[in-house]
Amino acid sequence: MSGWREDDTGLHRRFVFADFAEAWAFMSKVAVLAEEHDHHPDWSNSWNTVDITLISHDKRCVTERDRRLAAAIDAL
């Protein structure tokens, strides 16, 4: 999982794109993955930047579900 940082609050990664349209297209793809994995990110978007945090809130820690979704996001 290249570029992800893990700490007590989750797996974190910032994605930077050329413009808002590219960032939005990426978020749309991640949304489909999240539905397929039945696991949804905490995220924010500001113009060309998307910040994603993955954590299993029910377990209060990073789990394999988070790592699998991070790997799927990396594969986009």
Give residue ranges: language-model regions.
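Short aromatic-glycine-(Arg/Gly/Cys) micro-motifs in beta-strand/loop hairpins
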Residues: M1-G10
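Short Gly/Ser/Thr- and Asp/Glu-enriched loop/turn motifs at secondary-structure junctions
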Residues: D8, N45-T49
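Short, well-ordered beta-strand elements within core beta-sheets of diverse protein domains
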Residues: G10-A18
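Short amphipathic alpha-helix segments
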Residues: W24-V30
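A short N-terminal helical cap/helix-turn-helix that marks the beginning
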Residues: A34-N45, A75-L76
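C-terminal structural segments of small proteins and small subunits
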Residues: N48-L76
